[in-house]
Amino acid sequence: MAKDGGAADPLRNPRFQEPSVWQLFRESLFGKPRLLDCIQVEVTSVCPGRCVYCPHTTQAGYWRSRHMEAATFARLWPLMQESGRVHLQGWGEPFLHPRFMDFAALARKAGCRVSTTTCGLRMD
């Protein structure tokens, strides 16, 4: 029980609940649950497609295609450590980013599952 009467104090916080035996058992097997279920990261806005619904097409005069810098992705490390999954996608084709596999490896190193969405146009 917290000495300062904070959120962990059941006498001062009616929403406080002691962890159940099941919760303690599950945490002993799998670790504490992560704060975030998933974070989605747009690693690139570069795409060869011209889909009618996409900003590449609908906002062609304003759209800037570019890759995320590796240093920017690295700054997401604290969030990745609190997330169960990192989804690498966005309005671009993620496999066109030259560091895609490095980004996926960093997310795995943080303990995340990694997923992506691709149009598959450049899978050669």
Regions found by a protein language model. Name each.
Residues 6-124:
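Conserved alpha-helical substructure of the radical SAM core
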